[in-house]
Amino acid sequence: MPTIEQLVRKGRQAKPKKSKTLALKGSPLRRGVCTRVYTTTPKKPNSALRKVARVRLSSGIEVTAYIPGEGHNLQEHSIVLVRGGRVKDLPGVRYHIVRGALDTQGVKDRKQGRSLYGAKKAK
């Protein structure tokens, strides 16, 4: 236990915060290529077929990324933009694919909350 005098001189060293999105290497977004597009089931108590993709990032790391929204046009070799953000009921999925960027189309017929889904304003 340090004395008050030692604390005045040295102070406490803050522990560095651990990143939850290591594969992005400090970037907000990373480009990648889909190596496999498939569906998977969430953990209990939820039930669905969640759309996910294995993506090889430009940083050289392969990650599993969630495809948000209803319907998508992704297939193997599609170029996608990946952001951080986990999916709580899918273990190991810590990244999201950005809709409306690169090869990923926005969600069709989306009227509300369009920004996250790359949907243009309906005229």
Swiss-Prot record:
<comment type="subunit">
    <text>Part of the 30S ribosomal subunit. Contacts proteins S8 and S17. May interact with IF1 in the 30S initiation complex.</text>
</comment>
<keyword id="KW-0687">Ribonucleoprotein</keyword>
<dbReference type="InterPro" id="IPR012340">
    <property type="entry name" value="NA-bd_OB-fold"/>
</dbReference>
<comment type="function">
    <text>With S4 and S5 plays an important role in translational accuracy.</text>
</comment>
<dbReference type="GO" id="GO:0006412">
    <property type="term" value="P:translation"/>
</dbReference>
<protein>
    <recommendedName>
        <fullName>Small ribosomal subunit protein uS12</fullName>
    </recommendedName>
</protein>
<dbReference type="Pfam" id="PF00164">
    <property type="entry name" value="Ribosom_S12_S23"/>
</dbReference>
<dbReference type="InterPro" id="IPR006032">
    <property type="entry name" value="Ribosomal_uS12"/>
</dbReference>
<feature type="compositionally biased region" description="Basic residues">
    <location>
        <begin position="9"/>
        <end position="20"/>
    </location>
</feature>
<comment type="similarity">
    <text>Belongs to the universal ribosomal protein uS12 family.</text>
</comment>
<dbReference type="GO" id="GO:0019843">
    <property type="term" value="F:rRNA binding"/>
</dbReference>
<feature type="region of interest" description="Disordered">
    <location>
        <begin position="1"/>
        <end position="21"/>
    </location>
</feature>
<keyword id="KW-0699">rRNA-binding</keyword>
<dbReference type="GO" id="GO:0015935">
    <property type="term" value="C:small ribosomal subunit"/>
</dbReference>
<dbReference type="InterPro" id="IPR005679">
    <property type="entry name" value="Ribosomal_uS12_bac"/>
</dbReference>
<dbReference type="GO" id="GO:0000049">
    <property type="term" value="F:tRNA binding"/>
</dbReference>
<keyword id="KW-0694">RNA-binding</keyword>
<keyword id="KW-0689">Ribosomal protein</keyword>
<comment type="function">
    <text>Interacts with and stabilizes bases of the 16S rRNA that are involved in tRNA selection in the A site and with the mRNA backbone. Located at the interface of the 30S and 50S subunits, it traverses the body of the 30S subunit contacting proteins on the other side and probably holding the rRNA structure together. The combined cluster of proteins S8, S12 and S17 appears to hold together the shoulder and platform of the 30S subunit.</text>
</comment>
<dbReference type="GO" id="GO:0003735">
    <property type="term" value="F:structural constituent of ribosome"/>
</dbReference>
<keyword id="KW-0820">tRNA-binding</keyword>
